[in-house]
């Protein structure tokens, strides 16, 4: 498919810079502009079997290129998921029996959901086959062709919703301006589209495997707006009041735009509106179950967060244990060296103690021998003294001392 090169942003800026092989970047509004996206005339299906947005886009192209379910599967899967999510947001700001138009309604499931809730709902699609499929599947008013081709009454709609559509518009200003003319003064747009986060280069996105790369489908995603760009776009249309809601998918933005301040309805007001009809009661029951499921999801996410924190703590502790083990391993040689060094002086100390004990033992033995010898000598002396006391000499000595005392001569101690 040969495409005309596009070199102008929706905001009118022509000084676009290279962003990637397929996209240019606008510094004025933060939008990525496809170089080779489809042109306005290519939106009108002339050959439903071969034109880009014809029958095969819904039956095989999205499945083969993006891994999405085909339109038959989506008609079942989307009802309890995104359709309920979108309806909850719509009813936060508009209640039945408001008149609502969905651009690019695909299988028509959300149009049906709005109808069951009590809205006067209708949808638009480009492929004759898809329009027929949606009509037969959900029995809702689905019309063929771009919004500009429809004969719709100006200022007659309470809301126009477009989910994953605005990025496909070759001339979003013309299309959305026409849509704005169909809205009542207090009418709103509700939009879901990819959210380009400014500040990242293409090379950084590739290196980080950024999830937004999947949205850079240059043939069909012609304008990828940032939040700044989306705000500027709708303010230029006169819709100065914007409320960014929680997006269903992380790569998207989801918001409500209005000319007047947005005043949300309460859950009680929404429920009262739905309970007025049998089909509305069914929708209320689905919303209740959806709320229960969402709470379980939040609990599951919290558990996952706690589990991840526990895993992170466990990993940190394991790292600490491994570090300490490495420190112990590195200290083992030092410990062995110190042990060896300690063992050597301990051996010397043991030998010294052995020598001291041996010396002390010898000394004690010598002293004991000397004591024994002295004791033996003392016994000999005592024997000699005893012998002397019995001898004649001793007797004469005794008489001599007695004589000296008798004559008054001083004597030494006997």
Task: Name every feature range the model reports, one short phrase each.
Residues 164-168:
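A short His-aromatic
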Residues 148, 169-288, 408:
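S-adenosyl-L-methionine-dependent methyltransferase catalytic module, highlighting the catalytic core
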Residues 1-163, 173-178, 207, 246, ...:
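Conserved N-terminal segment of class I S-adenosyl-L-methionine
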Residues 365-396:
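Compositionally biased, charge-rich terminal segments
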Residues 401-414:
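Low-complexity, charge- and small-residue-enriched intrinsically disordered regions
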